[in-house]
Amino acid sequence: MVAVAGEIGKGGIPMAKAWHLTSRPQGLPTIDNFALREVPDGPLEKDQLRIRNLWLSVDPYMRGRMNDAKSYAASFQIDQPMTGGAIGEVIESRMEGFAPGDLILHMGGWRDGGVIGLDMMPNKLPGDMLAAGLTPQTFLHNMGLTGGTAWIGLLRVAAAKPGDTIFVSAAAGAVGSAVVQIAKAREMTVIGS
């Protein structure tokens, strides 16, 4: 059976499909390190949303999470659904401030949908920005984790100001390229590698 988020599975239980890490990659990950499996969706409890994912983010930091090593982000657990940034549509809500049809950014990605709670940090996409022409996917990069990391690192941590000269290592990477764009827009001189 091919399940779609919210589809009824065996025994009348709603099902979703989620990617699971089945083994730790040695070098580059291969399809053999992953499995797409059905996961029970269940009825909603307080502070939960049933969502249908529209876009998933695949970010460089996720490769590090496939290792069993201490890092700034917790390792993916073997045979458990993988998480990551995603844009989803709310199908059903028992969480204050969220209604069916809302588009959200959350960390319960790598699945077609399902039930998420507050631990997956759902945030409603700003309707005014969507109406102004920003696409929902923008909130997975420059208006999301990537852009937020660049913004905070450059303007709050480094406290860079117009006229400063900054050096950006990995200027071609996701966060580095966002730092370069923000710095140039704020009239800084950028040296990148």
Where are these regions (language model features)?
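Gly/Ala-rich phosphate-binding loop of Rossmann-like dinucleotide-binding domains
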Residues: 150, 180, 184
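NAD(P)H dinucleotide-binding glycine-rich loop of Rossmann-like/cofactor-binding domains
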Residues: 84-89, 96, 100-170
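Adenosine-nucleotide cofactor-binding segment
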Residues: 184-193
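Short structural boundary motif marking the start of a folded domain
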Residues: 12-19
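A short N-terminal beta-strand-loop micro-motif at the entrance of redox/enzyme domains
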Residues: 3-9, 25-54, 81
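N-terminal Rossmann-fold NAD(P) dinucleotide-binding loop
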Residues: 176-177
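Glycine-rich beta-strand-centered segment in the early N-terminal region that forms part
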Residues: 40-58, 66-110
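Residues that mark the start of a beta-strand
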Residues: 17, 48-50, 165
